[in-house]
């Protein structure tokens, strides 16, 4: 028996978020492998510039006919995107990928608590928070404090990204807003990347890996998330982001040989349960009769 149409509609945007998470975290693992060649900021520049070029070619966004409010929204979205990437890549250059994402996801979780209007959503956020703390294995005090600070700051920018991604999706057709925001984020990162990596950015093999990172970590996931945010409330989307540490841990294990401990495995179970609970709550809220 096929699932009801309402269930399919509620699962659709959730599947987009999960697919985007898989793409971005495996792309991040590839980026870590690229950092010895181009540096953290150089990788960010390659990722954003190449992703912006791809999106401009594919989407051909319209530059005229937008209001000042439209431009303010898309520029803020681009600044949040660029800042989030620069801060996060500085973090993973200093601390393990799983720990960096664990700290970063606290930003979306805080947004979930603030944006939630239902008490049960606070429960899912608390459960996910317990999971991401457990995923750290109680070893955050042994992390490079600068790297941990970068990851936490990236989490704040991630929360801003969620808010302005949703607003951009409502103001711009298709992926036009994403393409424009990516272009602004690329311009923001360009002087930092050139200062750190210089001519190393233009080595053909580095450009090839940079394109892979751009497609996996920017073009595909941001497009999927932008589509999902048109149909998901910000609070539900933010709790779904708690899947990111679990995905990052898997990517770190498969590509970077970072093994999981039993406590980290339990943490993954907690964040998955929290995410599933958030999905069920969102679907139940849509089915509830008004009045």
Where are the language model's segments positioned?
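Hydrophobic alpha-helical transmembrane segments of multi-pass membrane transport proteins
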Residues: 18-26, 30, 58, 75-90, ...
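C-terminal-most transmembrane helix of multi-pass membrane proteins
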Residues: 2-4, 46-48, 206, 242-291
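Transmembrane alpha-helices of multi-pass small-molecule transport proteins
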Residues: 13-14, 35-83, 110-111, 157-164, ...
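Hydrophobic/aromatic residues within transmembrane alpha-helices
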Residues: 34, 43, 47, 91, ...
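Specific alpha-helical transmembrane segments that line the substrate/conduction pathway
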Residues: 42-53, 81, 88-119, 154, ...
């Amino acid at each position: 028996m096929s699932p009801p149409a309402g269930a399919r509609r509620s699962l659709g945007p959730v599947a987009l978020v999960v697919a985007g998470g898989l793409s971005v975290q495996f792309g991040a693992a590839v980026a870590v492998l690229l950092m010895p060649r181009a540096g953290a900021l150089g990788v960010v520049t390659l990722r954003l510039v190449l992703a912006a070029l791809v999106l401009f070619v594919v989407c051909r966004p319209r530059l005229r006919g937008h209001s000042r409010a439209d431009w303010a929204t898309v520029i803020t979205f681009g600044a949040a995107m660029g800042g989030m990437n620069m801060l996060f890549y500085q973090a993973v250059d200093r601390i393990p990928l799983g720990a960096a994402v664990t700290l970063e996801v606290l930003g979306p979780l805080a947004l979930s608590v603030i944006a939630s209007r239902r008490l049960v959503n606070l429960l899912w956020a608390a459960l996910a928070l317990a999971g991401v703390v457990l995923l750290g294995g109680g070893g955050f005090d042994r992390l490079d404090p600068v790297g941990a600070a970068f990851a936490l700051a990236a989490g704040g920018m991630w929360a801003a990204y969620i808010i302005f991604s949703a607003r951009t999706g409502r103001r711009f057709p298709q992926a036009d807003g994403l393409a424009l925001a990516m272009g602004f984020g690329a311009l923001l990162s360009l002087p930092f990347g050139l200062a750190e990596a210089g001519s190393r950015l233009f080595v053909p093999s580095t450009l090839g890996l940079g394109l892979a990172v751009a497609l996996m970590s920017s073009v595909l996931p941001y497009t999927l998330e932008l589509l999902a945010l048109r149909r998901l409330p910000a609070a539900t989307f933010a709790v779904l982001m708690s899947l990111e540490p679990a995905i990052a841990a898997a990517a770190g294990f498969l590509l970077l040989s970072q093994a999981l401990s039993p406590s980290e495995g339990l943490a993954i179970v907690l964040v998955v349960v929290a995410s599933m609970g958030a999905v069920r709550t969102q679907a139940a809220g849509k089915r509830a009769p008004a009045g």
